[in-house]
Amino acid sequence: MAYRLLRALFRGLFRVTIDGITDQFSHQKLIITPNHVSFLDGALLALFLPIKPVFAVYSNITESWYMRWLKPYVDFVALDPTKPMAIKHLVRMVEQGRPVVIFPEGRITVTGSLMKIYDGAAFVAAKSGAAVVPIRLEGPEFTRFGRLGDVLKVRWFPKISIHVLPATTLPMPQAPRARDRRVLAGERLHAIMMAARMAIVPRETLFEALLSAQTRYGRFKPCIEDISFKEDSYQTLLKKILGVSRILQRFTAQGEHVGMLLPNATITAAAIFGATLRGRIPALLNYTSGAKGLKSAITAASLKTIITSRQFLEKGKLTHLPEQVTEANWVYLEDLKDTVTLADKLWILFHLCCPRRAMVPQQADDSALILFTSGSEGNPKGVVHSHASLLANVEQIRTIADFTPRDRFMSSLPLFHAFGLTVGLFTPLMTGSRVFLYPSPLHYRVVPELVYDRNCTVLFGTSTFLGNYARFAHPYDFARLRYVVAGAEKLADSTKQIWQDKFGIRILEGYGVTECAPVVAINVPMAAKVNTVGRILPGMESRVIPVPGIEQGGRLQLRGPNIMRGYLRVEKPGVLEQPSAENTQGEQEAGWYDTGDIVAIDEQGFCTIRGRMKRFAKLAGEMVSLESVEQLVLRISPEGQHAAATKTDSAKGEALVLFTTDSEITREKLVKAARESGVPELAVPRDIRVVKALPLLGSGKPDFVTLSKMAEDPEMSA
């Protein structure tokens, strides 16, 4: 009777729903592993699960007064961390057929993300051979019984959902020592818990996800700021989004690809969301690619209109672009301000109250925006992402990293770059964090000062940018940073060292590609390994295809919810080329994406990037990574700029060419360094050419197309 009354009370107050139940609880041996978000979690499971489980609870909690009061109604077993026999007792209970609930995190979350997973629960599952049923609780964290009251909009009676995920097994890992087996089992359970979180992510559009974040964190929560130093809340950002969307629909059509040539600023964020909510697909143009790059983008994406700002063009010394690029109609934001009518203002006011009614009908799998590859190995390609693929990458990041509304991001990487867009705009907005948008990562003195002034806690950048920030920063500028992540290029040892020595900060290295929205793998404090780029994100499948001549690693192929919809190529304007990759049998498989990167994945799942497939040279039948050549040169000249390329050689097929800004580099020095580090002499270039500066793309990466031409034509290097 008491159970029925309490169940009815909870269902009435919290509108509790439970989904996913079929035969998940019919297994003979069963362990239930829920996430832990509030003090209500145990009561919810006791009341709404269709079975009567035993709860594993720490002994210090079982001795409290309220647990003694609950003892006649709820079965629980006390766990004493100091007594190993408690785990064995739990294993026996599972083997006897008693379903057991274990909270693997061991404590209520204080971040909203998964906390540390204790391997005891995993060991019980592996030792007993029980089925593991993960459960996701959504909603209790908003109550006053959670521990997120300082970061979430707490409500008395929020809606609560209990999601029951399919049962899985956790076999005992193979390892020589018992401790290693426990650790590996714990990592496997952590992967199961992360997969459970990804499985219940709602399918939304970008605009719907922003509205969900506004509901979750509060409409007046500050969220975005730029160099005007006027911080906007979700409400004021929404007002700008609605205003831009209203104006955009006058000169663009639904489904049209709309070019945007804009800096890192709040108005750019408003333009991106404003375009998508009215069914337009923004194409974010690289303003450093020059007229030729813009023309390629216009052709590939079939752009008719480019939205920009006169002030931006003047400050960026880009006023020549509209004159040189006449293939599209240029629209200036400054000209649009005076076109706002009373009807527009009333429309905006109405939809501030009911913003979802401003959306045109869309699905999560519809195209959301277009990014462009760097063009480092050929013509830039348009990469079309759906709402679902972009938001999946945000959720993958949220699953492994504990970003909260207490954080503040410094976003200086350009938004036309996938790295800057996802981690510098979408991630902070969807996690309730505040973000400061700065228009250039090249201002090496200004960025550290702003990190200090705005109390930023999260900084993403390339190795080059982070190294330069460290050189110009005061030792106290980065005192508040707790996440510093490097991506887009290999993290240099010198950059790692200066950050550790000067600031006491460990840089976490990650790896991504535009086609994956872009993050593929990343080191985080909970799972990091030196000289790797971290583990593949949850929700993604990976496979390593062997490559003849390469012993360690192979070509990385990926499949998952964050993979692009397809390419738009200059050669086939407006035609979407869906991703596919060749498997080990030589067959093309749809849905897989071939990164073109040579990767090794160790037994713990950590990835090491060996280099680009296209950046391997075949010298006398041996495969040599051009990136390994560059790393060798960096050991003896860490301050210089170096890039390796190949040229045709009649004797060996190919020969190495080293371009460097250091005139002191000689083959003798390189041979000595190679012997000391165990690098074969075959990887030491004979052709060394000194240049004033390497040809670079707008993203800061070396222009390998130009370098290849320079390698074949010595006069170009002169």
Swiss-Prot record:
Protein family according to the UniProt entry: In the N-terminal section; belongs to the 2-acyl-GPE acetyltransferase family.
UniProt key word Transmembrane: yes
Gene3D superfamilies listed in its UniProt record: 3.30.300.30, N-terminal domain of ligase-like
Cited function: Plays a role in lysophospholipid acylation. Transfers fatty acids to the 1-position via an enzyme-bound acyl-ACP intermediate in the presence of ATP and magnesium. Its physiological function is to regenerate phosphatidylethanolamine from 2-acyl-glycero-3-phosphoethanolamine (2-acyl-GPE) formed by transacylation reactions or degradation by phospholipase A1.
Organism of derivation: Yersinia enterocolitica serotype O:8 / biotype 1B (strain NCTC 13174 / 8081)
Source superkingdom: Bacteria
Mode of membrane association: Multi-pass membrane protein
UniProt KW keywords: Acyltransferase, ATP-binding, Cell inner membrane, Cell membrane, Ligase, Membrane, Multifunctional enzyme, Nucleotide-binding, Transferase, Transmembrane, Transmembrane helix
Protein name (database record): Bifunctional protein Aas
CDD domains, A to Z: LPLAT_AGPAT-like
GO terms of biological process kind: fatty acid metabolic process; phospholipid biosynthetic process
NCBIfam families attached to this UniProt entry: PRK08043.1
Highest classification ranks of the organism: Bacteria, Pseudomonadati, Pseudomonadota, Gammaproteobacteria, Enterobacterales
Disulfide bonds: none
GO cellular component, one term: plasma membrane
